Design a protein with these regions (language model features):
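Conserved acidic residues
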Residues: 18-19, 97
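Long, Lys/Arg- and hydrophobic-enriched amphipathic alpha-helices
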Residues: 64-224
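SAM cofactor-binding core of SAM-dependent methyltransferases
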Residues: 1-18
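A mobile, often basic/glycine-rich helix-loop segment
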Residues: 20-72, 114-125
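A short, conserved alpha-helix within the catalytic core of class I
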Residues: 9-12, 27-42, 80-90
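Serine/threonine-rich low-complexity intrinsically disordered regions
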Residues: 5-8, 23, 49, 61, ...
Length: 224
């Protein structure tokens, strides 16, 4: 649930944005199209059957996808993330400040063509991995690894661990340890919260977990 004073809206405000826009795991959730290599690149479109089930059908890929790699393993798949690119561009067009996105990212689309597609096209249900993306529509989240080469060029790309270190997480942990040590004999709720900074930081900085997320920054002076 949102804290008080926070309002959910369907679109960006129709006015300049001065400050910082933060998007946490947004880009991977935006709708994407699916390219499949079958001797050449094709687009997988979804068809609905009379019984309500869904299946894929391959059609000729749009000519604007000519930037895809000329060759790939048979059956390779990659996401086409036009909506994510448009969202970033829309924010930057209104922004005087910084856009900061945290997400699962890959530098090049071609990298995804060489790995099993279910490693990057993921579904989640109840915070657990879900089933095939065509099953249980509306009951599971469908996400895709974000391909940075499909987005407007960012100003800075760092791991989440590097980003947090850059902005002082080590100092916050040291402060938490010091306050806990000073009050360990008679702990309070406040001191327990300070102690929890240690384990929370370990989780946020773990490169095999959350620390491996990518922090992508764009700075935009477009609006004055």
């Amino acid at each position: 649930m949102h804290p008080g004073g926070v309002e959910s809206v369907a679109a960006l405000p129709d006015q300049p944005i001065h400050g910082v826009v933060i998007a946490n795991e947004l880009l991977d959730n935006l709708p994407f199209r699916l390219a499949v290599f079958d001797g050449g690149w094709r687009e997988a479109v979804i068809e609905a059957a009379a019984d309500g089930s869904f299946s894929e059908r391959l059609v000729v890929a749009p000519t604007e996808w000519a930037w895809l790699p000329l060759n790939a393993p048979h059956g390779a798949r990659v996401p086409i993330q036009q909506r994510a690119s448009e969202w970033v561009a829309d924010v930057l067009a209104q922004l005087n400040g910084m856009l900061l996105c945290f997400d699962y990212c890959t530098a090049l689309t071609a990298q995804l063509a060489s790995i099993p597609w279910r490693d990057w096209l993921r579904t989640y249900r109840g915070h657990e991995r879900g089933e095939h993306y065509l099953r249980n529509p509306g009951e599971q989240d469908i996400t895709a690894q974000v391909c940075l080469d499909q987005l407007p060029p960012p100003s800075t790309v760092r791991s989440q661990a590097q980003f947090l270190a850059r902005w002082g997480i080590d100092e916050l942990v040291a402060e938490g340890k010091a306050q806990w040590a000073a009050q360990a004999a008679t702990p309070s709720v406040a001191s327990l919260l300070m102690r929890s900074r240690v384990s929370e930081a370990e989780s946020l900085l773990d490169l095999a977990g959350l620390g491996g997320f990518v922090a992508v920054e764009w700075t935009s002076p477009h609006v004055t």
